[in-house]
Curated annotation (Swiss-Prot):
One Pfam entry name: NUDIX
List of residues binding Mg(2+) 2: E112
CDD domains per UniProt: NUDIX_ADPRase_Nudt5
Gene Ontology cellular-component annotations: cytosol; extracellular exosome; nucleus
Motif Nudix box in this chain: 97-118
Protein name: ADP-sugar pyrophosphatase
């Protein structure tokens, strides 16, 4: 990004926003030129993408980690596969969506889960607002873990309720073999896995790899 020569040094080397200039705006996103002060007192600019739908002091949306639990079955993670025009292909993702006006993250998570997968669940936990791609956008989400009672009659034959223009395929993969199953889908179908999904699968693998073994480091 662009930079200018130092002006007055910023107080205590703290970086801060000076101004934001709108470059272009569409229905869902806008492009801005952000001018800020770096720790040395230089004025710099950054191209930033922001959602037009953001509400004050709330995250933009939610991503749902749906854990499907059934008697005598391994736990499964419910994912969605859909075509993403910016990627030019199909992606595997957690069910996700924007938070509506007056809606809590928990309510948005349950709504999006039912709309995209047909499943009804219960909230297990909700993260604080976390950033998505801070080098590009200010977009934030809550990551909400939801448990699904697969033995419940209402979840026996789930029927998604996609919105206009949404075409979603529901995929359930075993939690204890998630990373390997994702890798197999990538190899077979040449699709892309959302970074949140792949990071979750990696974390499961790392957590299950000799969890009680004390590492021995060589110096």
């Amino acid at each position: 990004m662009e930079s200018q020569e130092p002006t007055e040094s910023s107080q205590n080397g703290k970086q801060y926003i000076i101004s934001e200039e709108l470059i272009s705006e569409g229905k869902w996103v806008k492009l801005e030129k952000t001018t800020y002060m770096d720790p040395t007192g230089k004025t710099r600019t950054w191209e930033s993408v922001k959602r037009t739908t953001r509400k004050e002091q709330t995250a933009d949306g939610v991503a749902v980690i749906p854990v499907l639990q059934r008697t005598l079955h391994y736990e499964c993670i419910v994912l969605v596969k859909q075509f993403r025009p910016p990627m030019g292909g199909y992606c595997i993702e957690f069910p996700a969506g924007l938070i509506d006006d007056g809606e809590t993250p928990e309510a948005a998570a349950l709504r999006e889960l039912e709309e995209e997968t047909g499943y009804k669940g219960d909230i297990a936990e909700c993260s604080p607002a976390v950033c998505m791609d801070p080098g590009l956008s200010n977009c934030t989400i809550h990551i909400v873990t939801v448990t699904i009672n697969g033995d419940d009659a209402e979840n026996a034959r789930p029927k998604p309720k996609p919105g206009d223009g949404e075409f979603v395929e529901v995929i359930s993969l075993p939690k204890n073999d998630l990373l390997q199953r994702l890798d197999a889908l990538v190899a077979e179908e040449h699709l892309t896995v959302d970074a949140r999904v792949y990071s979750y699968a990696l974390a499961l693998k790392h957590a299950n790899a000799k969890p009680f073994e004390v590492p021995f480091l060589k110096f």
